């Protein structure tokens, strides 16, 4: 591959500052505080409707927002630090994507969900939704980790966030599906979007960088930090925007038990599939989280604790099997280079979660939900749909998510192939020193080795 220029001195400032300038202008024109964060409107409501400060939605939602925010910036960031020479980039590019993504998604989701009287009204719930949208982009980032420049990642974020907003609006508002924890809108969409981008950006000579694609002892320990943070806070992620009361309570419980069961299944299958009965840290770091994905759609439904445990067990099994057998096939046969294995942690468990949601919706009755049907399945509650119809619409939503992911990934992949974004060469992948000042002179030495190992005819 020829013609590479990884120097970010002009490219990165232009993209970062220009996009931030545009975002600020759009915020100035369109974005306003919602009625619970606007000083005049909130105090008028307190005076006219005898509302207390303690009833402000901030106090109900902010604890969940904190947990979700930690997942986005620490959980996802450190989960990707397993690469031995890519720790700076894993954490910091995650930081960059999330910082831009949450601003852009505030605008995109605001146009679809919070646009009134020509303005976007934002509050604590819109901040949570912006983090959710960013989570989908970070999942896609995992599929192309180590093989893209920061400018490519910013461009991917810009377009993917826009497509996420459209996809989410269609699924939730037009199809009328339920997906509070994002099995379809976040995990399935983000995973398959990233996989298709990775396929379009396929590198024939990635073997030149394979020696850096693995982990070392301390990098796997750092990645486990991300795993533990994600595992602890996933109940908040799935329940953050569900209705107050029993819905949120039930979602936390279902996620809690699903994750626990998934972890045991992961340990068991990891040892079972190893000829010497040893555990694989890749499985523990990733597959143990699949239980949270698997109940993203059904978490607020009457899944039952044992049903959540079954879902988690299945997710753990599927994820470990995927890492062991499917990832190599995707690489060798389908030419999909999935660095983090997002297909196994988010893709397949996301589809499983969508199917579980469709099955549970099929059995939604007034006897089971009572008056709670209005919160969980409002279209069944008001007679617009039967449980069978809701189940079919849940399945249709999965197809919509997959369709947007595949088509969107194709378009974005071809855009990112343009030679102006400073992508690393095949011999420079998975290497921090390409884009970072690495302390102690280590970066210069390592980059010299990288360049010297590259064939002469591939030099820019």
Swiss-Prot record:
Gene3D superfamilies: Ammonium transporter AmtB like domains. GO terms for cellular component: basolateral plasma membrane; cytoplasmic vesicle membrane. Disulfide bonds: none annotated. Its main location: membrane. InterPro entries: Ammonium/urea_transptr, NH4_transpt_AmtB-like_dom, RhesusRHD. It is found in: Basolateral cell membrane; Cytoplasmic vesicle membrane. It is a multi-pass membrane protein. Residues 1-10, 84-87, 147-150, 203-220, 274-283, 327-347, 416-460 are cytoplasmic. The chain crosses the membrane at residues 11-31, 63-83, 88-108, 126-146, 151-171, 180-202, 221-241, 253-273, 284-304, 306-326, 348-368, 395-415. Belongs to the ammonium transporter (TC 2.A.49) family. Rh subfamily. PANTHER family: AMMONIUM TRANSPORTER, AMMONIUM TRANSPORTER RH TYPE B. This is Ammonium transporter Rh type B.
């Amino acid at each position: 591959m020829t013609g590479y220029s990884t120097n970010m001195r002009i490219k990165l400032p232009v993209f970062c500052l220009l996009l931030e300038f545009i975002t600020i202008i759009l915020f100035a024109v369109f974005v306003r505080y919602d009625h619970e964060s606007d000083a005049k409107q909130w105090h008028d409501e307190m005076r006219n409707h005898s509302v207390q400060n303690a009833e402000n939605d901030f106090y109900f939602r902010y604890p969940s927002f904190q947990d979700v925010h930690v997942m986005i910036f620490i959980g996802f960031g450190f989960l990707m630090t397993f690469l031995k020479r890519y720790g700076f980039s894993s954490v910091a590019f995650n930081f960059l994507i999330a910082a831009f993504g949450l601003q852009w998604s505030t605008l995109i989701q605001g146009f679809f969900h919070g646009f009134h009287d020509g303005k976007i009204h934002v509050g604590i719930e819109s901040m949570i939704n912006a983090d959710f949208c960013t989570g989908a982009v970070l999942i896609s980032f995992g599929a192309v980790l180590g093989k893209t420049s920061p400018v490519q990642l910013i461009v991917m974020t810009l377009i993917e966030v826009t497509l996420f907003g459209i996809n989410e609006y269609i699924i939730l508002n037009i199809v009328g599906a339920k997906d509070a924890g994002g099995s379809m809108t976040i995990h399935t969409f983000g995973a398959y979007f990233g996989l298709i981008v990775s396929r379009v950006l396929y590198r024939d000579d990635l073997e030149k960088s394979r020696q850096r694609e693995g982990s070392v002892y301390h990098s796997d320990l750092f990645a486990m930090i991300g795993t533990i943070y994600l595992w602890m806070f996933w109940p908040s992620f799935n329940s953050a925007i569900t209705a107050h009361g029993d819905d949120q309570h039930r979602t936390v419980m279902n996620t809690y038990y699903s994750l626990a069961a998934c972890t045991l299944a992961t340990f068991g299958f990891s040892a079972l599939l190893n000829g010497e009965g040893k555990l694989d840290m890749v499985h523990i770091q990733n597959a143990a989280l699949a239980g949270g994905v698997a109940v993203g759609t059904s978490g607020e439904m009457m899944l039952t604790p044992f049903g959540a445990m079954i879902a988690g067990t299945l997710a753990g099994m599927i994820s470990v099997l995927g890492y062991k057998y499917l990832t190599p096939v995707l690489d060798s046969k389908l030419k999909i280079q999935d660095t983090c294995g997002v297909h196994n942690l988010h893709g397949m468990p996301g589809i499983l979660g969508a199917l579980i949601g469709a099955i549970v919706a099929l059995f939604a009755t007034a006897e089971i939900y009572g008056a709670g049907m209005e919160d969980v399945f409002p279209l069944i509650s008001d007679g617009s749909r039967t449980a069978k119809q809701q189940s079919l619409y849940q399945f249709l939503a999965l197809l919509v998510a997959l369709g947007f992911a595949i088509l969107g990934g194709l378009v974005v992949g071809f855009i990112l192939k343009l030679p102006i974004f400073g992508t690393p060469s095949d011999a420079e992948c998975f290497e921090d020193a390409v884009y970072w000042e690495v302390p102690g002179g280590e970066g210069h030495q390592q980059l010299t080795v990288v360049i010297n190992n590259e064939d002469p005819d591939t030099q820019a």
